């Protein structure tokens, strides 16, 4: 290959130009290391002093590592690795290198890339003597690539290109400095490889081109001299940019003595990734592109804990990366679920899910007020008449008029606990009906006033009231026909054995029939208007017992008439009437349904 053959020619040229005592590198033995002072004292008398600052150079080889078959040249001076512990930092900077040995013939060079550990040691003025000035200039000139367009300045001090990111510490500036013309110089780090890296693959940092060496040969950069501008060399259809912006800053290897002394020092080879392009030396444009090149140099690795990590590379923007970034920026959204509203049951069972009745009508009201439909289908005109009482207050309703007439005629007192006006008032009837304390769901005696009356083709719906409250009820249509002019709002009804219809514990209704009516105190009739109640007994029973019927029929009227006379006491007559009503209510119903039995018993003949 042309590139490797050029490197061989450069090596042969340098080896042939060397004096008899050639500089060779020998691997460190397992015995204890010598001190830097003793080691440098052995090296000092071998070569004349030079005023040029020199960095350790790694000479490239054209083949894979091989073992050294011939011993090193006679009279050669060996450089041994020295382990230096810095008192200021306390950390040991280690680097891997290769032992580079040159044969005396100069035709073929073999490098044994065996792992050895070397240190970068710093010496004072006159401690190290390098090659002759002219020979070193020739060696530098032969290693540069003319086609790449990158020509480092070769003055009395060799140029060195350093990454800008090496200047981390403001006190310890990591710029390359030029040795003084008086002859003071410093020794650069001697780079050797621990194990070879046979090939390098192109990455984004090198522009996609293979790099023949990942270890940079950095020289000292003269103070105040400008950094060479980046130049481009087209190789195999691609452009390789040679400049500081292509360098990936690595982990610098520095001499521990330079930390404590504060003198200008050289940055050693960097330890970037395999994609590092520090001081890339690409092939000339006339050379053919190389797919993969064996690495004559190996990237040294630093194990120091005080150096910084390599800079992160810019990620390649892909669709998957964009999706990941957008997914992290989004707020997590829960999957929309259809809201299932739990249906609450008003009571257990499927009927509890039925909707509410919006009309607000009770079943009892519908049963009472809705007329029955005739079988022929023709509906009669629904006639309703709602009449309300004209009195506005309880005192006006019950302090005068028919209510006062009824109390004075019967000599009743509402405050008396034994009077039926108190024991069977509307409040007490509703309470006993709810507690089911009414005998046979009937009220023995009761006096109520009509508050409102709603007439219909059937029975009339009435609202009854007394001084304690109000109660709903119905009036039979027979009473509406016989007492049409008397059944008006404000009239007082004296009732007995009134049935109470209780469809629920809260709803109770009075059913007034002709048999329940005792007397009506109306607004138009006056005090002397009395009504005879209907005959409670059947005709057959009345015919068989003619003496019983007048007594039963006349006794209520007699008690009411005696109430008009002051000398007579109504209290004595009323209990007898109440007892008679109680006896009649206790009679069995068969007593009224079998009139033939009474006649048979009266005559003494068997039935």
UniProtKB/Swiss-Prot annotation:
Main localization (coarse): nucleus
Biased composition, class Low complexity, residue ranges: 295-308
Pfam families, alphabetized: HROB
Modified residues (Asymmetric dimethylarginine): 281
PANTHER family: HOMOLOGOUS RECOMBINATION OB-FOLD PROTEIN, UNCHARACTERIZED PROTEIN C17ORF53 HOMOLOG
Residues recorded with modification Phosphoserine: 30
Any single GO CC term annotated in Swiss-Prot or TrEMBL for this entry: nucleus
Biased composition (Acidic residues): 570-581
GO MF annotation list: single-stranded DNA binding
Listed name of the protein: Homologous recombination OB-fold protein
UniProt-annotated stretches for the region Disordered: 25-49, 84-108, 196-308, 531-581
Organism annotation: Rattus norvegicus (Rat)
Subunit organization: Interacts with MCM8; this interaction is necessary for MCM8-MCM9 helicase complex recruitment to DNA damage sites. Interacts with RPA1; this interaction associates HROB with the RPA complex.
Signal sequence, start to end: none
Keywords: Chromosome, DNA damage, DNA recombination, DNA repair, DNA synthesis, DNA-binding, Methylation, Nucleus, Phosphoprotein
InterPro entries, A to Z: HROB
One GO term of the biological process aspect: interstrand cross-link repair
Function, in words: DNA-binding protein involved in homologous recombination that acts by recruiting the MCM8-MCM9 helicase complex to sites of DNA damage to promote DNA repair synthesis.
Subcellular location: Nucleus; Chromosome
Skewed-composition ranges (Polar residues): 27-49, 92-108
Keyword DNA damage (UniProt): yes
Domain of life per record: Eukaryota
Upregulating conditions: By E2F1 and serum stimulation.
